[in-house]
């Protein structure tokens, strides 16, 4: 039981941290443009995730916005903590555009 409680506390803390990160807050405050996001995806992500985002080296991203929170997606893109995915450093507007594009998948 103590293990479950600890796990829940850790999950809440991580979720809170990701939502209060200044970069994440900046991104989430912006209105993204799906067309610009698609161009960003094609230039940076399609090599691994496929031209249609249906997976290649990396997983399919269809429905990712329904499976993951926007904060989680932002963290995934900028952290590079899931090899072989590299760390990316999009500016806040580019990240907002990419998020908006991913919502269309």
From Swiss-Prot:
It comes from the Bacteria. Heme c binds at residues 45, 48-49, 85. InterPro entries: Cyt_c-like_dom, Cyt_c-like_dom_sf, Cytochrome_c550/c551-like. One of its GO terms (biological process) is photosynthesis. Residues 1-29 form the signal peptide. The keyword Transport applies. Gene3D superfamilies: Cytochrome c-like domain. One of its GO terms (molecular function) is metal ion binding. SUPFAM superfamilies: Cytochrome c. PROSITE patterns: CYTC. Keywords: Electron transport, Heme, Iron, Metal-binding, Photosynthesis, Signal, Transport. Binds 1 heme c group covalently per subunit. The keyword Iron applies. This is Cytochrome c-553-like. It comes from Synechocystis sp. (strain ATCC 27184 / PCC 6803 / Kazusa).
């Amino acid at each position: 039981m103590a293990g479950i409680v600890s796990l829940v506390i850790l999950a809440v803390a991580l979720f809170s941290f990701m939502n209060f990160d200044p970069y994440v807050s900046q991104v989430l405050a912006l209105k993204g443009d799906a067309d610009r996001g698609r161009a960003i995806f094609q230039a940076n992500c399609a090599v691994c995730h496929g031209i249609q985002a249906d997976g290649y080296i990396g997983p399919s991203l269809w429905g990712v916005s329904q499976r993951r929170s926007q904060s989680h997606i932002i963290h995934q893109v900028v952290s590079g903590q899931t090899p072989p995915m590299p760390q990316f450093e999009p500016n806040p507007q580019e990240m907002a555009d990419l998020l908006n594009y991913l919502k269309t998948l």
